Amino acid sequence: MPRRKGLCLFLQMLLLHLYGVCQAQPNYQVFDLLSVSVQRQVTSFLQSALSNPSMNEVYVLSTFKLQPKSTVTLFGLYSTSDNSRFFEFTVMGRLNKASLRYLRSDGKLHSVFFNKLDIADGKQHALLLHLSGLHRGATFAKLYIDCNPTGVVEDLPRPLSGIRLNTGSVHLRTLQKKGQDSMDELKLVMGGTLSEVGAIQECFMQKSEAGQQTGDVSRQLIGQITQMNQMLGELRDVMRQQVKETMFLRNTIAECQACGLGPDFPLPTKVPQRLATTTPPKPRCDATSCFRGVRCIDTEGGFQCGPCPEGYTGNGVICTDVDECRLNPCFLGVRCINTSPGFKCESCPPGYTGSTIQGIGINFAKQNKQVCTDTNECENGRNGGCTSNSLCINTMGSFRCGGCKPGYVGDQIKGCKPEKSCRHGQNPCHASAQCSEEKDGDVTCTCSVGWAGNGYLCGKDTDIDGYPDEALPCPDKNCKKDNCVYVPNSGQEDTDKDNIGDACDEDADGDGILNEQDNCVLAANIDQKNSDQDIFGDACDNCRLTLNNDQRDTDNDGKGDACDDDMDGDGIKNILDNCQRVPNVDQKDKDGDGVGDICDSCPDIINPNQSDIDNDLVGDSCDTNQDSDGDGHQDSTDNCPTVINSNQLDTDKDGIGDECDDDDDNDGIPDTVPPGPDNCKLVPNPGQEDDNNDGVGDVCEADFDQDTVIDRIDVCPENAEITLTDFRAYQTVVLDPEGDAQIDPNWIVLNQGMEIVQTMNSDPGLAVGYTAFNGVDFEGTFHVNTMTDDDYAGFIFGYQDSSSFYVVMWKQTEQTYWQATPFRAVAEPGIQLKAVKSKSGPGEHLRNALWHTGDTNDQVRLLWKDPRNVGWKDKVSYRWFLQHRPQVGYIRARFYEGTELVADSGVTVDTTMRGGRLGVFCFSQENIIWSNLKYRCNDTIPEDFQAFQAQQFSS
């Protein structure tokens, strides 16, 4: 009785305490972010927190379950306009880490990492993220998993400080249920203490000094609850004793009934002597004497019950079920179900075979353990599902796919193919082909210079345009017979389909009129009608009634610019279009000079005349010519002002060039330093998935820059902006723009930008592509298709402006330039490599300096000259190979005549231009063909440069 009173008194005290706690008003706000209505108001919630100086603490609470090794974003806040991040929390299961990214006050993203988190394991976890210091004090982020602190990062930049959010400018994205991934709770708590917020997840934590009192109350409450549990346990024992006593009374009453003494039997006031000394009869067996199924035996001392049935334990009167599952009769990992009586084991787990078992009793459970035998999935006739010719490795209850079998190369994604090698005896290439081994283990065969085909079969290629003189027995395009054996035409154009290429067909259109007299060389027109009296007949004139000898057609709609009222095809008439030759529907013009931003050479400075005297695509009004790193981009527009990066590649478009950006793709994994290196530095993949463990992430396997062109044929595998060689878009640069007999070059581009023809005996000029390069390999076939002239032709690289570029030029014979002003210039026969750095720019000084073989002060330096002094031959094809590595100044040029190497500059080092654009060059020479042009990004330093340096240091 005293104990019961104590229990009641304790319960009263506990209720009073809880009442007092409940009466306290919380000083925080809780928002359920999984509620649709709350999601719609998330912008106002955030703005309230950011603008309220007293709101210094923010908590995010989440309960979730993630499948093993998964990488998911649990929750994030994003801009509705451009989908940029404001706040994002991502779990990277494969790396056992999590990342928190948020917008700093300077508008840039800051990344925080929490390591050693094993929370992507198929189990439910509770997360509490505490951000402190929104407005004052030190800013830190602390993470709790399942009520336990798992990481803290201190001295952080303030998140979202000073940022104004408009209504509807932010939207919330949360983890969506997919497979085993699910989220049951996501709450935002503004304000409050750690212990108060932790209690929402039933976590009892103390914060620090300010929350010490609350922590003490929580500990007192826990102690009182523990004491109450002990008293309830004692009460349970008392009740069990009362049950036993009740059972004893029941048996006593049963004995009284067996003596025939009912409840109404009158008891005498005085017990007779005979009756008082009579021993009452012992209880006899009846239907309720023993537990069901237990045998009851009458004895002199009363009834006696036999043993409890199998699967039960007790005295025969009371029998309770035995829990056989305590003996672990089931196979490891199989669920045991206790029944009354007996037990049952469920089916064997996946990857095992065996039967289910069920039985009754301790002995059965001890003697009959469930047996599950491992299934060898690798012997199912399908190699376990692994790719053919790869290793299938059986494991207990499962299997895994390994690498390729010996003699095969590849992986589980691309398959395992028979190993190819360039080693002797395994080289599959033609005897006149070069063999190279790729990263994926495959082999590439390329026909050598002067040969053409698919690499496995090669035939003689006299004009070195990539097509053999005779057809080869292979289906590839480059196995077909060259339709112009002695004139390079890498596009194999044949207008009249007579199997004679246009380049060598005297009547290319087959209209019976020779090309020299035909006013439509590539369009049959026997009548030669020419309404506007320009040099093009009506059949091929894109402006039949308007004289336009240039036939320029910006939008390629078949209507020449001269008669097209919308030259760029953007739907805006020329008279109203602020960029007449560049499509710009928006017509943006931020400097208001009447020239649209997209075609404005100074988009931030008024310059309506668009003057660009040095032809560097930067208007004179904003051209500073201050270039600290020498890569051709002035410091004010260079995305890496002090690091050489002529290509200006900026993969993540953050305004920082890849060359000086430590995280090119902005996925939170640094390119080189820990926790990197990033196995896909140009494609976001925070999880770093790499199923075949080859060091290249799955997302960029075989296409490193994700430009949809596989690396094997991609001319720039690490630059998504350059995929194929293409000079269809080019800039013309006239190097002697003034004079009485001015003749500018006439450029024709063929074969989808891989062939250029110049037809005029012209003043010096360039055709320059718009693509800029860092390191580059540049090759092509050079051919002068005439016998009537003997002047200069060549190519350029490292072009930065009309005063700064490298040129490789070839003169046929010795000759003094016909104009001796401003100085006498003498050209010698042979190949010359020059660095042009002209103070005067295009004009007579640069013209004569280019003609002259040698150095010219303030104009040109001669870096190398072919000592043979041999000029080019009429109607003979030559193949050149150029290597330029501007980061170290490495230059090397080689020339082939047929299959023979005829000139080699060797290693030449010059750092005048640190990268730039590519193009071709002519000076007073007509009918030049640059065919089968190819460029490829390449920053790898050649081996001969190391030997060159060693030789230089030793001398």
From Swiss-Prot:
Glycan-linked positions: 609, 938
CDD domains, A to Z: EGF_CA (cd00054), TSP-4cc (cd16080)
First and last residue of the signal peptide: 1-24
Residue ranges constituting the Laminin G-like domain according to the UniProt record: 25-192
InterPro entries the UniProt entry points to: ConA-like_dom_sf, EGF-like_Ca-bd_dom, EGF-like_dom, EGF_Ca-bd_CS, Growth_fac_rcpt_cys_sf, NOTCH1_EGF-like, Thrombospondin_3-like_rpt, Thrombospondin_3_rpt
UniProt xrefs under Pfam families: COMP, EGF_CA, TSP_3, TSP_C
Disulphide linkage map: 285-296, 290-305, 308-319, 325-336, 330-345, 348-372, 378-392, 386-401, 404-416, 422-435, 429-445, 447-458, 474-479, 484-504, 520-540, 543-563, 579-599, 602-622, 640-660, 680-700, 716-937
Swiss-Prot/TrEMBL keywords: Calcium, Cell adhesion, Disulfide bond, EGF-like domain, Endoplasmic reticulum, Extracellular matrix, Glycoprotein, Growth factor, Mitogen, Repeat, Sarcoplasmic reticulum, Secreted, Signal, Unfolded protein response
EGF-like domain span: 281-320, 321-358, 374-415, 418-459
Residue span of region Disordered: 610-678
GO biological process: cell adhesion; positive regulation of cell division; response to endoplasmic reticulum stress; response to unfolded protein
Residues of the TSP C-terminal domain: 728-942
One function term, GO molecular function aspect: calcium ion binding
SUPFAM superfamilies for the chain: Assembly domain of cartilage oligomeric matrix protein, Concanavalin A-like lectins/glucanases, EGF/Laminin, Growth factor receptor domain, TSP type-3 repeat
Family: Belongs to the thrombospondin family.
Function: Adhesive glycoprotein that mediates cell-to-cell and cell-to-matrix interactions and may be involved in various processes including cellular proliferation, migration, adhesion and attachment. May play a role in ER stress response. May participate in the genesis and function of cardiac and skeletal muscle.
Subunit structure and binding partners: Homotrimer; disulfide-linked.
Protein name as annotated: Thrombospondin-4
Source species of the chain: Xenopus laevis (African clawed frog)
